[in-house]
């Protein structure tokens, strides 16, 4: 693989911007993280790798697996779900947020709405039972999915995030009576990112301040939505979480300045007279992100980078210009003067005939201005580079000669 390395001096001088320095900002929560979803870049973190109770934020994993089952054709939004005695009886427990389930039969779509809008625990359990047959088997699916995402240190005991004390005899085998689901803020960001990127339709539900369930109006627990007490423009999700152990927690998401931002605030610092501490902390964190980071397009779709080319075997032309498959965008700190390298790697094997749009190389951005681990993805940002045009096959005598030269070179 042929590599060409260039150095990019990322200097952002945006007029009169006076960014808040990272060391000067402290989110009002015990644990927190903020990321840009499309790139996976970490923009802020605070004790983000410590596994702690996350309460109903757990339902994001549940919802992901429901959407996955829909994608796989196992169920659909209109599939009826029969409510078993376990989730039905839980609706009478005042310690668990819920909706009435007296009809004992609802669609997947209705239960998704109840789960995401009003954080209905029985709705989540009913979905878990529909997908896996039992909540126990569903929890095993949740664990497997987290392993697939590289999350190794989570504790999962149910599909809802409730404390086991609320569930009576329906607790996960081998778990303790007071166990709760635990993930780190870092891991929650991974969950939220996977959900939003794979199933963006979830935002059509989570952006609703209210919805209708079985003829009654249900209200969102996310008070940052429109017409809610802690409203902030642009917020379209995602999930609250509240237990005695988890405190007031919230995963928020919004698009600001072209960035799809995900914030995780766990165990917000509660203040007397302020029931919206988690939302205030989230808004302050978003202000910090908006003031300190920006999205930059380094190569536009269809453009090459520093005359990037790729070899073509047996073509009328020996090389083809490699261009960006789509806009190549990175997130950088405002005012940063950090040297970061861009590496273009051309694929070594591609033979004519070659069609325009065929991937012929990769562009990798080696970001040096990092917060914590830098990215929630395993690799640094990299992007496909494709052939700018078609390359036809060469005349047979040229191909014969090329093969002869390669044979001689290999044997000598």
List where the protein language model places each region.
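Structural motif marking the loop-to-transmembrane transition
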Residues: 1-5, 54, 104, 108, ...
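Sec-dependent N-terminal signal peptides of Gram-positive bacterial secreted proteins and lipoproteins
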Residues: 2-23
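A broad, structure-centric signal for solvent-exposed, well-ordered loop/edge residues
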Residues: 8, 41-42, 50-53, 61, ...
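Intrinsically disordered, low-complexity regions enriched in Ser/Pro/Gly/Gln/His and often acidic
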Residues: 12, 131, 393-394
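Residues in and immediately flanking transmembrane alpha helices
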Residues: 15-16, 72, 300
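Active-site-adjacent loops and short helices of periplasmic peptidoglycan-processing enzymes
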Residues: 20-186, 196-199
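Domain-terminus/edge residues, biased toward the C-terminal soluble/receptor-binding domains
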Residues: 168-169, 176-182, 186-412
